């Protein structure tokens, strides 16, 4: 009887820790995906950055062009205010597996030696993570 209780407790603990590992791995994917999207932006691939945003429906080409222009203006503003973004690293990432959402915490390192943490809300659709 005691052996059975110990076995149940051990199995429960094993299950608990295996779920945490899976959640951690999924959160890591959220962080890496957000970094990839922002690396596109950093390397002037504005189209890929814009395509990394979730939209339930297609958007008109004129609106897509406006989003691309906004991304270019953002990079221009960062160059003007901080001498540009020099590096993007992942600080942390969290995930809500029930709602298929997550947050990536990216650290921007600027040319003027300042840093800024940026939170990137993410959403998963059909196995792909997108920026919200």
Residue ranges and their predicted role:
Residues 18-43:
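Short, low-complexity N-terminal intrinsically disordered segments enriched in polar/charged residues
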Residues 1-19:
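Sec-dependent bacterial lipoprotein signal peptides
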Residues 39-42, 51-57, 102-107:
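N-terminal non-globular leader segments, chiefly Sec-dependent signal peptides
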Residues 87-132:
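Exposed beta-sheet edge and beta->alpha loop/turn motif
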Residues 12, 34, 102-104:
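Small side chains
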Residues 5, 41-46:
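Short, compositionally biased low-complexity segments
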Residues 31-32, 46-99:
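Short solvent-exposed beta->alpha transition segments
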């Amino acid at each position: 009887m005691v052996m059975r209780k110990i076995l149940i407790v051990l199995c429960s603990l094993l299950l608990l820790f295996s779920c945490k590992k899976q959640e951690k791995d999924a959160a890591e994917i959220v962080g890496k995906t957000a970094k990839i999207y922002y690396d596109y932006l950093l390397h002037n691939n504005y189209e890929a950055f814009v395509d990394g945003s979730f939209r339930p429906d297609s958007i008109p080409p004129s609106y897509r062009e406006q989003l691309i222009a906004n991304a270019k203006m953002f990079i221009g503003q960062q160059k003007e205010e901080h001498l540009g973004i020099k590096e993007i690293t992942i600080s942390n990432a969290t995930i809500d597996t029930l709602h298929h959402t997550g947050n990536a915490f990216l650290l921007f390192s600027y040319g003027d030696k300042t840093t800024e943490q940026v939170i990137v809300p993410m959403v998963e659709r059909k196995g792909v993570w997108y920026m919200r």
